[in-house]
Design a protein with these regions (language model features):
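Glycine-/acidic-rich phosphate or pyrophosphate-binding loops and their flanking alpha/beta elements
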Residues: 161-184, 316-329
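Conformationally flexible catalytic loops at phosphate/diphosphate-handling active centers
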Residues: 80-176
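Single conserved hydrophobic/aromatic residue that forms the stacking wall/gate
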Residues: 1-9, 14
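A structural-propensity feature for long, helix-poor, extended segments
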Residues: 33-51, 226-245, 365-395
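Terminal amphipathic helices with adjacent charged low-complexity linkers/tails
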Residues: 85-124, 228-265, 271
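Anionic-ligand anchoring segments at beta-strand to alpha-helix junctions in alpha/beta enzyme folds, i.e.
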Residues: 166, 180-181, 187-216, 328-394
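Peripheral docking tails and interdomain loops at the edges
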Residues: 236-325
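Conserved thiamine diphosphate
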Residues: 34-86, 110, 263-276
Length: 395
């Protein structure tokens, strides 16, 4: 609620095309009950505001794409909402590579920055903004902004390319991971994409070819960049949404992908599913279930993973859990009670390991919404290879 009301109160960012950037840890909206935990409901409630929406899937991406958001906002004069998964990404401790601030300064469009500053309110050059308009001109004024939004995907792609060149980490509005000739793929955004990538590698060793299209630039949704990375061999697509829109024919990302192929000949079969509401854990076995569902003669649409739905029977059945943690990775669990110091001690431990050794590290802390006295579980991983496992330890 707080984020949606804040954006509604920031309509002048849209009105005046101010290059504001909101960095948001996406969380659940209150419905039948309040939840403080993470999903994409609050972000999806803001998709009609006019803000450009940029999604990150890991701690490293959150840093890198934060820079892309600021650079693109200045260049495009469009405000950006850069979001990442609440708790799963916002509260995770990871060892990352920091960006060089001097290099970032050189990427800023000086011309666009000057133009923004020149538009500052000045009593010596008064202007009128935020007027009330009647029906004779309002519609035309709304449509006149189209060109600014049409330019955003190319601007974002440009800065993603510059960040990629600087870091060696590939960024595009949409990225593809998996077999070049995959027939069955998933489309998703957020931290679940890291789990999907690891699952694709696990299944590839068993001779199964799958793929993933990761959505980074969600708004404006750029058709040309999506189709550019989509393999020509794709026949079936499962779109995963981390939100629930009661009464709709489908969830937002699913409907966007469906609309993209509307009217095209030989378009792939597209199904949609939900996962991860209120930080519900999404494990490799659940991703395997999504790919298994795509293999069926009649795949289930409007499905859920991560729960057993014995009321409306939409959930996919999950086989035994699979462990895909890389060899050499150590996993630890520490149980405690809220305010007993267990979480704080483990935060210090993982920071010491990350700072004073060559090990990669990851820490995530699972707890309920009570204050002191509630259940806590600290999940620590460290190893010799990068750790891409945004789910609770399975040991």
């Amino acid at each position: 609620y707080e984020m949606t009301s804040s954006l509604v109160g920031s309509e002048m960012c849209i009105r005046d095309r101010l290059p504001a950037v909101f960095h948001v840890s996406a969380r659940a909206l209150a419905s039948h009950a309040l939840s403080i935990f993470g999903d994409h409901q609050d972000v999806m409630a803001c998709r009609q505001t006019g803000f450009a929406l940029l999604a990150s899937g890991s701690v490293q991406e959150a840093q890198d794409l934060a820079a892309v958001a600021h650079l693109s906002a200045i260049k495009s004069s469009i405000p950006f909402l850069h979001f990442f998964d609440g708790f799963r990404t916002s509260h995770e401790i990871q060892k990352i590579e920091a960006l060089d601030e001097e290099e970032l300064k050189n990427m800023v469009s000086k011309k666009s920055l000057k133009a923004f500053r020149d538009r500052a309110l000045n009593p010596d050059a008064p202007v009128t903004r935020g007027t009330a308009q009647n029906g004779d001109v309002y519609f035309q004024a709304v449509e006149s902004r189209n060109n600014y939004y049409n330019a955003v995907p190319d601007i974002v792609a440009r800065y993603m390319g510059e960040i990629s060149e600087m870091t060696g980490r590939e960024y595009r509005p949409f990225t593809y991971y998996g077999a070049a000739d995959a027939e069955n793929i998933i489309v998703a955004m957020g931290s679940v994409t890291e789990t999907i990538k690891e699952t694709i590698d696990y299944l590839a060793k068993k001779g199964r070819k799958y793929g993933l299209v990761t959505v980074h630039l969600y708004r404006p949704f750029a058709e040309k960049y999506f189709l550019k990375v989509l393999p020509k061999t794709v026949k079936r697509i499962a779109v995963l949404d981390r939100t629930k829109e009661p009464g709709a024919l489908g969830e937002p990302l699913y409907l966007d992908v469906k609309a993209l192929f509307q009217g095209q000949s030989n378009s792939p079969l597209i199904i949609g599913g939900r996962y991860g509401l209120s930080s519900k854990d999404t494990t490799p076995a659940q991703i395997v279930a999504v790919y298994d569902n795509l293999e069926l003669n009649e795949p289930k649409n409007d499905f859920t993973i991560g729960i057993v739905d014995d009321v409306t029977f939409k959930s996919l059945s999950i086989k035994s859990e699979v462990s895909i943690v890389k060899p050499g990775t150590t996993e630890c669990k520490f149980y405690g009670l809220g305010s007993d110091g267990t979480v704080g001690a483990n935060k210090n431990t993982i920071k010491i390991i990350g700072s004073h050794t060559q090990k990669y590290c990851q820490a995530y802390f699972d707890y309920d919404s009570k204050k002191s006295g509630g259940y806590t579980c600290s999940h620590l991983r460290f190893g010799d290879k990068p750790i891409k496992a945004p789910y609770l330890s399975l040991i």
